[in-house]
Amino acid sequence: MSIGFYFDMSRCTGCRACQIACKDKNRLEVGTIYRNAHTFSVGSFPEVKCYSYSASCNHCESPACMAACPTGAIDKREDGAVILDREVCKGDGACVEACPYGVPKLWEDGKAGKCDSCYLIREAGGTPACVAACPNRALDFGEVEELKKKYGDALVSDIAVLPSSDKTKPNVYINAKEAATAAARKAGKAWD
């Protein structure tokens, strides 16, 4: 079994409610975020198109952060969630350097931290804070096969602002706007 996130670009307004909910739930320091919402523009006037993307840990099938960690502080749970144990972390930053998505962050105390898919909330029957906070329901979370059944076959894991999914096999499924995939093709990132 593998868990993952679904993101619908057609529903996201870039409000950052997901980002704020994650920051609040994790009691993160100023300047540290585990979920990051951005709005991107493609083209030039008068043919400008925009799209927003909300990024966090993709709980990859082959997590580069876990492979790079020399202390074993990063582990993949049975459900597929990639968890970082800050008590075991020695703060060498190998996970930060290894993740192609830039997900793990070093805190002021020198130790790393990252999205844990709110696994304690999920174990209590809830949903991740970011998903619960989204006013437009642009985010969802669940077992990968269930997400694919629920949202269909048109989902992608590669868009212009992300590195190729070939290396880590991220468990993020995106209902992408044409602007995000067209920009990828124009940049020579034609994954489809």
Can you say where each PLM-predicted feature lies in the sequence?
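Non-ligating segments of multi-cofactor redox enzymes
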Residues: 1-192
